[in-house]
Amino acid sequence: MRLLVQKVILIYLARYAKSMKEIQYYGPADVLPFARIAEFLWVYVGSALAYVVGVKFMGTVRFILFQIVNNSLRTFAWYLKEVFRLGALALITIARAFCVAHINIIIINQVFFLWEMFELKLYL
């Protein structure tokens, strides 16, 4: 199961890296390195968080199935609740990494745009 999660994440990263080559950033030339750093953080740190949470989620599902097979079904509701809780945690972690990186890119773009406008005023 862990190998399957690794393959899915690697396929996702490869597709994302290919699509990132086609994206052009609009704005001052100074923004490009910072935007690349923010994208790097989103891709690798966000995917690492998603991987860790995904592996924990799959491990919990496997543990729950083992417990259900070995024990009676009376604690099935508790196990089901744990599965949904960890699934929600995985979704929240992925969404949080996505939002933080894109908010950082927007803020960096705006800061450098304002700085360029300020420099333009100084020259005039």
From Swiss-Prot:
One Gene Ontology cellular component: membrane
Protein name per its UniProtKB record: Putative uncharacterized membrane protein YMR119W-A
Main location: membrane
Coiled coil location: none
Record's miscellaneous remark: Partially overlaps ASI1.
Keyword terms, alphabetized: Membrane, Signal, Transmembrane, Transmembrane helix
Annotated transmembrane regions: 37-57, 86-108
Signal peptide annotation: 1-19
Subcellular locations according to the entry: Membrane
Membrane topology annotation: Multi-pass membrane protein
